[in-house]
Amino acid sequence: VSTSNDRIKVWTRIDLTFRASTKFNNPYADALVWVDLEGPDFSRRVYGFWNGGDEWVVRVLANAPGEWHWTSGSSPKDAGLSGQSGRFVAESWTAAELDANPNRRGMIGASANGRGLQYADGTPFFLLGDTWWSLPSFRFPLADKATATGTLGPQSTLNDYVAVRKAQGFNCVGLIAAQPAWANDGKPNSLQMDDGTWVRAAWKQPGTQSAKDMHNEGGRPFEFPGKVPGFEDVFPDMDRINPDYFKTLDRKIDYLNEQGMVPFIEISRRDSGQCWQKFHDWPESYARYVQYMIARYGAHITLLSPIHYDYYEQTIPAEDYNVPINLAIERYGKPPFGTMLTANPNPSTLVNFGTDSWIDLHQSGNVREHYTYWYLTEMFEAERKPAINGEPYYAGLHQLGEPYPLRVPPDSEDDRIYVRSGLYGSFLSGGLAGFIYGAEGIWQSDVEPESLHKMWDSFGWESGNQVQHLKTFATVEGQRYLELTPCTEMVVPNKTGPGYAYKGWSYCAATPDRSLIMLYFEADAPMEARLRGVRPGDRFLPRFFDPRNGNWHDPGEAISVPRNGVLPLPPRPDAMDWGLMLQRL
C-alpha cells in the first residue's frame, strides 16, 4: 500500500485519505466521496468509503506506467472531502519482482478467447482455490508476518495456512466478508419470525445449539441495535456499518495479496436476505453495501461477488438480488480497475442470473455429485465467459443439514476419488478456468474442542495436495486447453452408474479439429471404452495421466481410427481413475 504522491509501482494500491469537515449523523449512508482519476488511457471516477470517525478513503492504483493525477469530490460538498488533488508517477516492476509476486502482473481477467483467466499483462492464471469462508473472523488469526512457521495445530495462523496452500500450488481462497446475524448468542442457529421470515440460517457451533461466532478483533460487521422487531439484538442495522471489522479484513486481504494469493470475496451470505429486504430500504440499502465493498476492495487483486447465493431457500429469489446489484452497477459502474464479478451459486450463475448479466466469471456451486458437472457445459454453450466449479464435493463431507448419504471416511481413497471426480470431471465439462477445493473442518473453520474435524488437521489431508495436479493435466500442451470443447458423448460408454455418485462415469473434451483430445475416467468406469467422432485413418498417440501424483506416463503405441470412425481406446492401467490424452499424429 502506498500513500505517496510521487513514484509508485503499477498495480500498487494507494489509499487517498480525506477528513470531513461536516459531522454526519450516519456517514456510511449520508455522504459519497470520489476522485476523478486520469492516467495513460484511463479516465474514471473512483468512489471511496467511510472508514470511521471523520475519515474517508479512496483506493486507487495505476494500471499502466506514466503520470497520473486526481481531483476529489463529494456529495454533499464538504471542504475536507471535495476539491483536493494530487499526482503520482507509476513505474513498471522488474522481471525479478514479477516473479516474486505474480499479483504485480495486475488484475485477473478473461483470456483472449474468453474461456480461461489471465493477469492484466497476459500471463495465464489457472485458478486453484481453497474454501475459507470464515477467513474474516477470529478463526483465521493474522500473525506477525515474520512468525509463520507452517506448523499446523491449535496455534496455527492465517500465515501458516497460506504457507501450506501456497506450497501446494494454490493461488486463490474463497471467503464470505460478512455474516451479519451470526453469533453464539444462546439462540438457535436457525431463526425465523412468527410469519416465517428468516432471521438467520447459520452453521451450528460445535458443542452448542447456537450459531457460530464470526466476529474479529474489530467486532461485528454492522452495528446494533437492529431494525428487525423482536430480533434487534440478533439482526443488526444494515444501514450502519462497522469499519473496524473491515479494517481487520483489510489486513488479511493485504497479506493474501502480498503472498501472491487472489481472494475471492463474497460480500454477504444469502440468509441475511429476507430481513434485509423487509426491514431496510431495499434495494438502496443493499446497493450501498455492494458499492462500499467495491470501493473498499476494488483496488486489491481480487475476485468480487455481490452475493453468496449457495442455496435458494432461507433467502430471497436470485432476481431480487439482481435489482440492487444492477442498481449499484448502473449508478457507479463496474469495479474501476477491472475486478471480475462472480458469485457462488446453486446450481450455477447462469441459472440464477442468466446470460448477459453482471457476471464476468461463471460458476457452478454447492452442487456436488457428478451429474451436476453438466451445469458447466450448459454455461460453456450459453456464452463465452470463463467458468469454474466453485463449490464441489468437500473432502471428508459429513453433513449439510442432514448427514451426507455418500459420506466415506475422511482422507480415505474413496474420499480422494470423490475430490478427483470433481476436479477432472468439472474441467472437461467446461470449467476450463480452474477449480475451488473445499474440505470438512476448513470450509466451516472448526476450531472448537467438540469439532468433528479441526481445521488444522484437515489441512493435512492428501486430497488438498492433489489439487495442483489438475494444472499439470490441463497445461500439458501449454495453453491449448483453452481450445477444448466439452464433448463427453464422444466417449462410449460414458455414464455407467447412478448420477448421484462419483464413480463409473467418463468425460471428454477436444479441440474443434480433434487434434487434441483429453479424457478422464472415474474409478470403476468400464475398462473398455471407444471414441466416436474421429476421422477414419487418423492416428493418435495415447498417454495416460495419474491424478494421484500428477505424473504423465510415457506415450503408448500409436492407434489408428478404423473405417467405421469408432476408435477403441487402450485400457487404462487399472480400475482406478485416470486421465488420458490423445494427440493426433
Regions found by a protein language model. Give the residues of each.
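Aromatic- and carboxylate-lined catalytic core of secreted/periplasmic carbohydrate-active enzymes
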Residues: 2-6, 23, 27, 123, ...
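Non-catalytic, glycine-rich low-complexity segments
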Residues: 1-41, 46-48, 87-94, 501-510
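Extracellular glycoside hydrolase catalytic/binding regions
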Residues: 288, 295, 302, 308-457
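Short proline/glycine- and polar residue-rich coil/turn motifs
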Residues: 50-52, 559-565, 572
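Short tyrosine-centred short linear motifs in exposed loops/low-complexity segments
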Residues: 9-12, 54-56, 60-72, 76-78, ...
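Surface-exposed loop/edge segments in extracytoplasmic proteins
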Residues: 40-47, 549-557
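Extended acidic/polar, glycine-enriched regions
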Residues: 36, 42-114, 135
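Active-site mouth of glycoside hydrolases
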Residues: 32, 102-105, 111-372
